[in-house]
């Protein structure tokens, strides 16, 4: 335990309650259990996205209690808070999906409001589902007080007939059922066995991608991103997060010391090597924006060209994230990449040690394992996340090409203004091999909320068309998506981007070799179409209306604040 008398000097924010005139404030705090002794200690917030509606988050309230124990053991005063979550897998394919990305910024704002409003000296943020991680990190960057992120852990794989399955197995089962390859009862068996307990979705999907990126950056406990939700190691790392944040206070380490340009470079490197989610581009841009780090969409292509894809992880591979844990986890991957010159080993982390110092305590990848391929024989010679540009996406678009055999595709567009219309077309066999399915007006402003298209993409894969039909959108894709898919097309249709003027029958080319996305329509014809195209009014009611009117382009991370360093300064 840290010397409490020494910790009194680190009450940089909670000391506002010390003076005589703050007696009323202290009266309220005494009602929560604080005493004269407590007021001598730093106040550390512990805020989680606990909720009972999803396996990703159902265990996080108990994890908050563990983090509090770590804070207490380190000599500070912990206070637990709660904020919201939106479960992507439950919202998917419904109107609720518009609230998913929106929730990222609500989480960020609510954490900042709770921690700032109560003058905490430091905090631990605990998250489990996709938007929890970037939402927490945006708040951490904006607050810039000692903070640690703690991940709720990955779910164990389900099992059916001796085979590992997961949530994406159910989504793809719908396509197979529609194609006549599975019966309704067989799909029900997959449904009933896919999710056996608590934890984030089990492949290299968005939750595990972002948890990994945060660990690589140095903002969570080493090894924690790959600890399964129900493992003893996970409980230990949650408690350690409480101790670590107090240590950050003592050492004077702030998130801005950790979240440097080099930290983001390493996060992108490991994301490429592991075959992470397309959502990593959106979220890392948003976190970098909050951290005042210069990061652009084009930077991702720089790393894509020099970092090979090594991991045989779902959605395009064989293994789930727990299998990576079994062969050494994220630290073993980092050790391998560091040894081969891909990472910055001298960066400081939330432990007070450098990346290289942290990794000394971990074993190498298990000899003979085949979850992570060697650099000499990678899954793919370059990274699987590609930024495309062209006259259909002048600001850029994001493609994930892991497991995709087709390197370029040209076909006629079939254009839909909603996912529901596109799903109906797939279910009624209107989509044929060679088509380019386009879903627009579902971007950050147009959705509003930039919904994911996992229901649609999984149906296409389930029907055996994953390599034969391209799917394009100004919306997003789940980390569980694979196939010939391109998302985040910017500018979006709602902003008058070229995708708004695409018509059914127009030829579209997606080329991963040239990194181009082209609509074969002349500039003159596009200008003519602009004269007759009516952009629908921007949604304006409630939280989605606020979001639609403030959110930036996906090419800038879909951020919702007005902070610009050249205009406002940042204190």
From Swiss-Prot:
Key words, A-Z: 2Fe-2S, Amino-acid biosynthesis, Branched-chain amino acid biosynthesis, Iron, Iron-sulfur, Lyase, Magnesium, Metal-binding
Binding, [2Fe-2S] cluster: 56, 129, 201
Cofactor binding comment, as recorded: Binds 1 [2Fe-2S] cluster per subunit. This cluster acts as a Lewis acid cofactor.
Xref: InterPro entries: DHAD_IlvD/Edd, Dihydro-acid_dehy_C, DihydroxyA_deHydtase, DiOHA_6PGluconate_deHydtase_CS, ILV_EDD_C, ILV_EDD_N, IlvD/EDD_N
Pathway: Amino-acid biosynthesis; L-isoleucine biosynthesis; L-isoleucine from 2-oxobutanoate: step 3/4; Amino-acid biosynthesis; L-valine biosynthesis; L-valine from pyruvate: step 3/4
Residues given in the record as Mg(2+) binding sites: 88, 130-131, 452
GO terms assigned for molecular function: 2 iron, 2 sulfur cluster binding; dihydroxy-acid dehydratase activity; magnesium ion binding
Chemical reaction(s) catalysed: (2R)-2,3-dihydroxy-3-methylbutanoate = 3-methyl-2-oxobutanoate + H2O; (2R,3R)-2,3-dihydroxy-3-methylpentanoate = (S)-3-methyl-2-oxopentanoate + H2O
Active site: 478 (proton acceptor)
Protein family membership: Belongs to the IlvD/Edd family.
Subunit structure, interactors included: Homodimer.
Record's function text: Functions in the biosynthesis of branched-chain amino acids. Catalyzes the dehydration of (2R,3R)-2,3-dihydroxy-3-methylpentanoate (2,3-dihydroxy-3-methylvalerate) into 2-oxo-3-methylpentanoate (2-oxo-3-methylvalerate) and of (2R)-2,3-dihydroxy-3-methylbutanoate (2,3-dihydroxyisovalerate) into 2-oxo-3-methylbutanoate (2-oxoisovalerate), the penultimate precursor to L-isoleucine and L-valine, respectively.
HAMAP family named in the record: IlvD
Protein name from the UniProt record: Dihydroxy-acid dehydratase
């Amino acid at each position: 335990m840290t010397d409490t008398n020494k910790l009194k000097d680190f009450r940089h924010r909670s000391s506002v309650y010390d003076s005589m005139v703050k007696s009323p404030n202290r009266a309220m705090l005494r009602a929560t259990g604080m005493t004269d002794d407590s007021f001598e200690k730093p106040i550390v917030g512990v805020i989680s996205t606990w909720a009972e509606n999803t396996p990703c988050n159902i265990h996080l309230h108990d994890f908050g209690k563990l983090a509090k124990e770590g804070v207490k053991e380190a000599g500070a005063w912990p206070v637990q808070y709660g904020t919201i979550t939106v479960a992507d897998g439950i919202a998917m394919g419904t109107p609720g999906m518009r609230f998913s990305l929106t929730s990222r910024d609500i989480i960020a704002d609510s954490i900042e409001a709770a921690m700032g409003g109560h003058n905490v000296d430091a905090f631990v943020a605990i998250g489990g589902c996709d938007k929890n991680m970037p939402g927490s990190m945006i708040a951490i960057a904006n607050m810039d007080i000692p903070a640690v992120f703690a991940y709720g852990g990955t779910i164990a794989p389900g099992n059916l007939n001796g085979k590992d399955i997961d949530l994406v197995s159910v989504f793809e089962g719908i396509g197979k059922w529609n194609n006549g390859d599975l019966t309704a009862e067989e799909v029900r068996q997959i449904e009933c066995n896919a999710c056996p307990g608590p934890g984030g979705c089990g492949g290299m999907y968005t939750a595990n991608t972002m948890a990994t990126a945060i660990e690589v950056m140095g903002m969570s406990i080493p090894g924690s991103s790959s600890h399964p939700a129900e493992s003893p190691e996970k409980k230990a790392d949650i408690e350690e997060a409480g101790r670590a944040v107090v240590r950050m206070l003592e050492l004077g380490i702030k998130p801005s010391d950790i979240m440097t340009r080099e930290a983001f470079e390493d996060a992108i490197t490991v994301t490429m090597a592991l075959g992470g989610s397309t959502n990593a581009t959106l979220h890392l841009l948003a976190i970098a924006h909050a951290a005042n780090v210069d990061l652009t969409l084009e930077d991702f292509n720089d790393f894509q060209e020099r970092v090979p894809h090594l991991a045989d992880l779902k959605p395009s591979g064989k293994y789930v994230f727990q299998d990576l844990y079994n062969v050494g986890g994220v630290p073993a991957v980092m050790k391998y990449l560091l040894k081969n010159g891909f990472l910055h080993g001298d960066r400081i982390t939330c432990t007070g040690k450098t990346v290289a110092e942290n990794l000394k305590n971990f074993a190498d990848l298990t000899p003979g394992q085949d979850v992570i391929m060697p650099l000499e024989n990678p899954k793919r010679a370059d990274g699987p996340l590609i930024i495309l540009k062209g006259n259909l996406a002048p600001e850029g678009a994001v493609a994930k090409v892991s497991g995709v055999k087709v390197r370029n595709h040209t076909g006629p567009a079939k254009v839909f203004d909603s996912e529901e219309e596109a799903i109906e077309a797939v279910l009624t066999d209107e989509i044929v091999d060679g088509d380019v399915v386009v879903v627009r007006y579902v971007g950050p402003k147009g959705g509003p909320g930039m919904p994911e298209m996992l229901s649609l993409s999984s149906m296409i894969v389930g029907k055996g068309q994953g390599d034969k039909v391209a799917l394009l959108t100004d919306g997003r894709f789940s980390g569980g998506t694979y196939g010939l898919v391109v998302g985040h097309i910017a500018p979006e249709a709602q902003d008058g981007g070229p995708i708004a003027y695409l018509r059914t029958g127009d030829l579209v080319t997606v080329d991963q070799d040239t990194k181009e996305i082209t609509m074969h329509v002349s500039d003159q014809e596009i200008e003519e179409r602009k004269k007759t195209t009516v952009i629908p009014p921007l949604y304006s009611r409630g939280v989605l209306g606020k979001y639609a009117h403030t959110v930036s382009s996906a090419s800038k991370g879909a951020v919702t604040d007005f902070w610009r360093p050249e205009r406002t300064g940042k204190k």
